[in-house]
């Protein structure tokens, strides 16, 4: 019913997080049928006035007559369900859902959708237009606060369109020279799960790459000497800042990408970017659900132990046929399950009214 419907988005939406899904709505419904409105959201109760909209985007799909469906897209890093938003909606799309974190059958409205990243969807004039009109719709008091609200819109514009990432799939080298190149950068996160799991995984990967006769570039951004891992990771701390265009160019050149769950075990923005770029991906095990499983040896190469990681690095460096196979698998997964359009279609297909 997408051709007959209009989509109304709550203007309190954090567009820096929601832009990926807004782009998907444009792709499915048509841009002229997607807009912002406060008309349908008076019944949406907020558990915490300001943090709420770091977590989700509320929207209403309005069909012919008075028919409508209320949808929440929860893109928070944690697996927690926002109870107030869940009670309000008909469909609760969750980016980071872990079925082991909730009793079976407790949340029947949940549908798992694709991981997102930060992408530009509007030019500067359109960004300013939506910023000021939505600020007025929020009566100058958006839930995230005016300063953050404005920063979100400009951050969205400072990103790159998803087509920039998609075009990298055609630019990648299918073969490597005698001294291959691997690029990986990360923040040295202070969250406990990152201290326990994410940061050590990333350090082991970097150490493996640095031990090989290849050109490795990257490290951890970490300017806080009080971080509990700062001393242990000191030789991997970098202070150079990479511009977004430089980052994309280096990731395109890199023989493959490395992925591991991030803050609170979330998918992280890197996964969305790598799939859009059609990268061959070496990944530690995925913690949360996906709209369809990433298959080892088809879409991604999984490794967990040091030995497995070392073997995976060697395969991706020295087996061009396998690397090309994973690149094609990543592109195929992206097209069917992880593009903005695919992320919205899996939501629509979960409810007969929305199909």
Predicted regions and their residues:
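Generic surface-pattern signal
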Residues: 30, 118, 145, 210, ...
């Amino acid at each position: 019913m997408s051709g007959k419907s209009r989509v109304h988005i709550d203007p309190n939406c954090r567009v820096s997080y929601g832009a990926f899904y807004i782009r998907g709505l444009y792709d499915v419904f048509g841009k002229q049928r997607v807009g912002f409105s406060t008309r349908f959201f008076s019944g949406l109760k907020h558990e915490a006035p300001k943090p709420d909209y770091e977590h989700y985007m509320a929207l209403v799909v309005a069909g012919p007559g008075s028919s409508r469906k209320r949808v929440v897209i929860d893109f928070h890093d944690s697996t927690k369900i926002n109870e107030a938003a869940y009670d309000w909606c008909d469909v609760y799309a969750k980016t980071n859902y872990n079925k082991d974190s909730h009793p079976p059958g407790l949340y029947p409205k949940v549908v798992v959708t694709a991981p997102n990243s930060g992408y530009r969807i509007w030019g500067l004039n359109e960004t300013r237009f939506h910023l000021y009109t939505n600020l007025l719709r929020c009566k100058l008091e958006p839930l995230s606060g005016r300063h953050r609200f404005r920063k979100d819109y400009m951050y969205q514009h400072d990103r790159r369109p998803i087509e920039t990432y998609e075009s990298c799939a055609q630019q990648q080298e299918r073969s490597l020279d005698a001294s291959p190149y691997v690029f990986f950068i990360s923040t040295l996160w202070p969250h406990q799960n990152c201290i326990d799991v994410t940061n050590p995984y990333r350090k082991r990967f970097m150490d493996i790459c640095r031990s090989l006769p290849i050109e490795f570039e990257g490290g951890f951004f970490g300017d806080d000497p009080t971080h509990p891992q700062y001393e242990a990771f000191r030789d991997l701390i970098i202070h150079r800042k990479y511009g977004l265009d430089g980052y994309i160019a280096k990731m395109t050149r890199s023989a493959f990408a490395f992925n591991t769950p991030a803050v609170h075990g979330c998918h992280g923005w890197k996964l969305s970017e790598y799939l859009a770029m059609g990268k061959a991906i070496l990944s530690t095990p995925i913690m949360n659900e996906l709209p369809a499983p990433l298959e080892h040896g088809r879409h991604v190469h999984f490794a967990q132990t040091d030995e497995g990681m070392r073997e995976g690095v060697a395969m991706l460096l020295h087996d061009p046929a396998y690397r090309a196979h994973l690149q094609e698998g990543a592109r195929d997964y992206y097209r069917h399950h992880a593009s903005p359009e695919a992320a919205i279609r899996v939501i629509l297909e979960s409810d007969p009214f929305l199909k």
